[in-house]
Amino acid sequence: MSFSSLFFTAGFLPLFLLIYTAVPGVRRKNRVLLCFSLLFYLAGGLHYLLLLLLMTALSFGFGYLIEERRGERRWFVIGISLLLLNLAFFKYSAFFLRPLLPLLPFHLPGALLPLGISFYSFRLISYLSDIQSGRLRAQSFESLLLYTADFHIISQGPIVRFREMEAALRERRMSPEDFCEGMFRFCLGLSKKTLLADHAGKLAGQFLPLDFLHAASQGNPPSVLASWLGGIFYMLQIYLDFSAYSDMALGLGRVCGFDYPENFDYPYAAHSVRDFWRRWHISLSSFFRDYVYIPLGGSHVSLPKLCRNLLLVWALTGLWHGASWNFVLWGLYYFFFIMIENLRRRREREELEEERVGTGEEGERKEEEKDRDREEKPEEKAAESAGGKEGRGFPGFRRQSAGERGKRGREIRGRRLLSHLYTLLVVYFGWILFRFSDFHALIAALKLQFGIGASALWDPITALSLWNNLIFFFACLLASTPLFHYIGISMQNGLQQSLSLRRKEERRSERIRDNESFGDDSLQLFDRESEAEAENEHEIALRRIQLRARRRKRALRRAAFFYYLERGAAALLFLALSVMAMVGSSYMPFLYNQF
């Protein structure tokens, strides 16, 4: 079952939300969520559900053994080994046995991979690791099974840690605001998948199909323009597809009262390869950082060990994505660029440290010379106090002119633009490695990017297809940038400011009411005329404050009404367009279902 299927959208999800909202109490809601999660996973096959239950039961047992015998590391090693062996058997057995397949009496089908096994295996590994490190206590089987099988995140993540869900499993609330925001996020992700990602995938296959070598062998190879457009549309597809699922998962989580961590932060806006991986599949990157990279020493080690740590992390990252050599090559490709950027950062830190040390020694000598010069030339001292010379205690500092500041700003913007283009190019060629599992096709596709083996620089059919999809292309580009995110944030900030103003007015009215009794006691100190005037002025001031509070409250209600009306209307529009797209086109599964 997939989030982007009609059965899920029109049947499974409405039934779940109806029962989930009707059932009172967190414990009962947890059981409803658990039952629907098991039904969701059962759609993939009973044997895969039994496997998930078995892995959860083993992790439950080893969790208690690790906690009770914390000094004995063997239980932790055995538990992690069983989880990894299970993952390796189902995901990599065909990969390692591929040379022996002709000799085997049975066939290993590609559909052998259970749904979400990479994601729930890593979640269980993080669960045992956190118990071993003392960051988490062993949990009940029901809580652990819900954490493992939660249908929001079972198939494509994010890889949530148990401690990130622990508080919500015990106590959470469902507010109308959370329901509205969650459904908006879900419908936004659904439309991103059905309206943008699926069509981008079709265009990628049209411009540069996976079997383009067959057309090339018949004398009809793609043009350079077609090869680049195929790569660009695949680059857009894989981001829009995977981020769409994350949007839908986070939206469903918010509807149910969970606050899952963000998994994407507009990675195509990054300015370095390291920055890209801080924004792309954040939960996977943080998993390898916390459970592989940092235990090996992280970056605070010698250069050879740093190289070893990064090589292991990126080889595992590539293997995690798929059982094929092109994924290993893809991971090593990123290792190369990450290593270069780390070496550059190390060199910059060393140069800065040397400069700081040099400034400390040379700076004292220069300051002494400047003190002597200032005593001999008092006019320089006066000019220095006006900011025209180097400031005392800040060697080499002087106030920049407007022209110098503008030039400096242009240089910074130019460097940021170049670093952004460099990052996009690295990521673009990385997706070429990621897409083609056949090495002959991969090498031919890389050659096509530089015009080697292409039919021409461009061809009319490709140009016409691009022209017909130009608006769609810009829509995909805009969806890959944080523009609409910033618009939504500004709307939310406006609503939050209105809420804060309302709270201030309420606190002010409470202070006025609290002071009424004090004012009544004080009025007896004046004569009757002064008492009447003071009481009248007090009533007028109170009415003004109450009138202002009512106006602010009405304005807040209007702002909240129109804000949620816009969100609800947008969600319904996205949902309607997505349903029409699902009805009118063939089904395309999420790309990351294969991982």
Regions found by a protein language model. Give the residues of each.
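Membrane-embedded transmembrane alpha-helical bundles that form the catalytic cores
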Residues: 1-594
